[in-house]
Amino acid sequence: MEYNPTILRAVHWCRKKRIPFISWTDGTLNSEKNIGKVQRLSRSYIIKRAAAFVASSTASKQAQIAYGADEKKCFLSYLTVDIQKYLREKEDYSGRELLYVGSLIQRKGLDLLLPALAETSEDIHLTIVGEGQERELLTEQAGKLGITDRIRFLGYVEGEPLRELYHNADVFILPTREDCFGLVILEAMCASLPVIASKYADGAFDLVAEGENGYIVDPEDTHAFAEKIDQIFADENRLKEMGTRSYERAHAFAFEEVAKGCIDALCYVMGKAVR
């Protein structure tokens, strides 16, 4: 939920009318590490008065508990996409192609990925999908690192062309400095892609099973980041196994599955047995 004056008034009204309310958030301790004292107090005020809590990730749940939520009243309802639009099995992982999808802004950490890419095998390439104010700086950085010929900037892509890019890639990579969830990881998993995700993509800890369908890395450790990229491409058969595992794990994030957390929270507040 948004923590603004309107929400605070709504909470006060619910309390006055004795109407229970549910707090929902995708915020995490990482994404909210720089908020001010007043914002922290407002979060605590709301959460301590909520009848139940819905969190969009395990990290969001941990944040609500840190603000005073009762863990027994917390329910997970993951953020998701229409997975049916993206689900696609894949057989060929021989292209050695990394894919990034997202904005070209400082927060997304592409400036951390490029030095790592420069340390990897020269036959590994990167396709960057998205637009943003950092594009010129990233182009210059790639030139200085001598990897211009290993990178494609495709600009903004959506719909079926984007789904084709997912399908034609071999590994998805998200080097973000901060993301509450990282829905592009789930899109890539639906397309049977192994994933290398930043530890600052808070949803990655729910989406990526370490060593099974990908890896979670510290994007600020350039050498370790590069090693993980080389490692994931080292065995094509293993890469295919990881892609298959991504495809299988993605099904747990179908609408009907993630909605269960919201339904359970409503049932709890209404006094019914949680399924």
Model-found features: residue ranges?
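A short, histidine- and acid-enriched strand-loop-helix "catalytic/donor-clamping" loop
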Residues: 4-5, 19-37, 49-52
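Short alpha-helical donor nucleotide-sugar binding micro-motif in glycosyltransferases
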Residues: 156-157, 164-169, 262
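Donor nucleotide-sugar binding/catalytic pocket of nucleotide-sugar-dependent glycosyltransferases
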Residues: 43-88
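Aromatic "clamp/platform" in nucleotide-sugar-dependent glycosyltransferases that forms part
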Residues: 177
